[in-house]
Amino acid sequence: GSTWPSRCHSTLLGDRPHFIQPAPNRVDLLFKDIPESATGLYVFVLLYNGHPEAWTYTLLSTANHFMNVLTDRTRPRLGEHFYTDHGHQLFTPHPSEATTQELGAWTRHYLAFLLIIICTCAALLIALVVWGCILYIRSNRKPYEVLNPFETVYTSVPSNDPTDEVLVFERLASDSDDSFDSSSDEELELPQPPPAAQLQPYSSLESADASRGRSGFKVWFRDTPEASPEPLHRPTPPVGPDYSKVASKLRSILK
């Protein structure tokens, strides 16, 4: 076990110097009253039945004055040789002194380079964030179209033909209107308008027609106009009062 030296009563130190004494725990060794001549390397071997089981060593120094070790961590200058043959003479190298100006210049260059790298990375990061925000806004923007409510819409070809003038009345007076006397109930005979002139096939209205009151639009007609297809469901004519007589009277009054 780990306590076998303390239980082994036959442990012998053998031929040992007088300044080496066993410790009270019978495991360690103590150096006591060491003379100046005892300086050297000591090797300790543990024997068990004449066979070595373990060993260790220690270096003992009895110098009255110890010198501190000088550690030089600076780089040697160009052309300096520390180990020079001086005829078996001990040469102690002296540490090179780094000037404050050289160290300050190197530090400034390093800090400037580091600052440039940081500024470049920050600018790239800001540009990336702005670009991402623009893409996000564009993706969420809904396209729309502004419609002009005042756009001109033509439902028919304009013309200045007096035969095309038709009065349309959206709302007329009722049959009980008192603005007409009893004699106005008689139907007024109006002359029929002259028939429209038949245009030749594929003829056009030239500038001469425009001088006679035409609008100037050129209209082409087919030789044999195609018949309109029969509607599937014919609309039923609305059933209501006939205002044709009233419209004729109003038209005669307006003329």
Swiss-Prot record:
UniProt biased composition (Acidic residues): 176-189
Motif position, Internalization motif: 154-157
Compartment annotation: Virion membrane; Host cell membrane; Host cell junction; Host Golgi apparatus membrane
InterPro entries: Herpes_glycopE_Fc, Ig-like_dom_sf, Ig-like_fold
Reported modifications of this chain: Phosphorylated on serines within the acidic cluster. Phosphorylation determines whether endocytosed viral gE traffics to the trans-Golgi network or recycles to the cell membrane.
Function: In epithelial cells, the heterodimer gE/gI is required for the cell-to-cell spread of the virus, by sorting nascent virions to cell junctions. Once the virus reaches the cell junctions, virus particles can spread to adjacent cells extremely rapidly through interactions with cellular receptors that accumulate at these junctions. Implicated in basolateral spread in polarized cells. In neuronal cells, gE/gI is essential for the anterograde spread of the infection throughout the host nervous system.
Virion surface membrane side: 1-110
TM annotation in the entry: 111-131
Protein name: Envelope glycoprotein E
Intravirion side of membrane: 132-255
Region: Disordered, residue numbers: 176-210, 223-245
